[in-house]
Amino acid sequence: MVSIKSINVLSDSLIKLSTDLLVLGQKEGGSLHGLDSGLNDIVSSAVSLESFTGESGKMVHTYGDNLTKRVSVFGLGKDEKLTSDGVRALASKISAYANSMKLESFSVDGKSFGLNKSDFAQAFAEGLVLGAYEFLDYKSKKKDPHTLNTVNILGDVDASSISKGEVIANGVAYARDLGNHPANEITPEIMASQAEEIAKSAGMKSTIFDVSEFQKMGLGSFYGVAQGSVGKVPAKMIIVEYNGGKKEDKPFALVGKGVTFDSGGISIKPSHNMGDMKYDMCGSAAVMGLLKTVAELKPAINVIFAIGATENMPDGNAQRPGDIVTAYNGKTIEVLNTDAEGRLVLADVLSYVNDKFSPVAMLDFATLTGAVLIALGDKATGLLGNNEDLMNEVKASSKATGERSWELPLWDEYTDDIKSDFADIKNIGNGRLAGTITAASFLKEFVGDTPWVHFDIAGTAWGPKKPAYQPKIGSTGVAVRLVYNLLENRVN
């Protein structure tokens, strides 16, 4: 949950403002832009005493005067090396510091952080919100829950970008919350209910298909995964339609894997760290975070949000290794490993969305393979796709938002590895080689000629991450910022 209630942009003078904490930025070798004269040279004295030069990562804290109780100066580093992602990380440290001081509000001199620039302003707001994120919903003895009621950003800053950054970061925080909730609290039914609620609030059309409808609809691949939970935790296919663009414009489709708990099914996983399999719905969490963001910011583009939500459980009715199922597009699949279930869910959702909505492009998000961790570790999302132009759009947004990703090849030769002796294709490759690529090769069978990029977020969806605005533990809300940037670029 987010512990900042609101971020306000004010034109108040720093000298006249009453605040618990005033935050200033100083570039390496730079000055405080004459602000210190209004604070009786308090800051200059502290800076001199600490031999502070504005070096990146360094900071100085001192007491202020009657109106300004405390003043903190954060080093920005060299001007030419300051990036929007660096600003985002710095802002997250500022809100974390204010939280640790249990302040109800604090103020930031926008000019000293370069917040008249739109990208810096948006990144700063994102960092403030994400740096204050914590998840304490299930602590019976919660630590003193503290909320920063207000952050005031002062001066000539890009107010619209501040507002947009706050909304986007709240979308990321929502995706984090969904991932952090346990599987007994975020079921397919609850996820569907939340999607309906967001859609209704924004005037969007939502359609929820129950598992009882899957076979009649031809969703045989998805149904196979859901069999082990039928009658207990029923699967849902969630579709939300946002029409912000022209009526004649084809929609952009976002598809999420929503396996709310993955035991592996009959091909059951080892017990070690199986609790982490609540995170196997983080692809759908990204789609839900984007749904929330789009509902609030209302970009001028048509978007389809689609989620396949189910558990993957062993049961007397569960799918068996060796079963053959028929997907929505008519392809037959030999299921040789029930723990390679995410691709079976996505196969039907991708082909259904492609058939019913004829999207201009599709992106899918899934914690799909452990192999992507072997290839890229936890530092980057794996990207694979069938269209160079769309892939370049994704890469540009990856660079712009600091959400690192890396393209892996998807050559036709890899399709040979998923050919089956008894069906059209099988749901695993040949042995341990190129697991991420063969999984994407499987998905490619269900997108037709539609431009498509697959995000394998198994390495980036949860766990401790390096940037300061990422959580120390738990769900990261990966892909929300990147994809909203891409949608916005499409509009522009």
How does the language model describe each region?
Residues M1-G258:
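Short amphipathic alpha-helical segment within the helicase RecA-like ATPase core
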Residues A192-N492:
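A generic structural signal for tightly packed, nonpolar segments enriched in small/aliphatic residues
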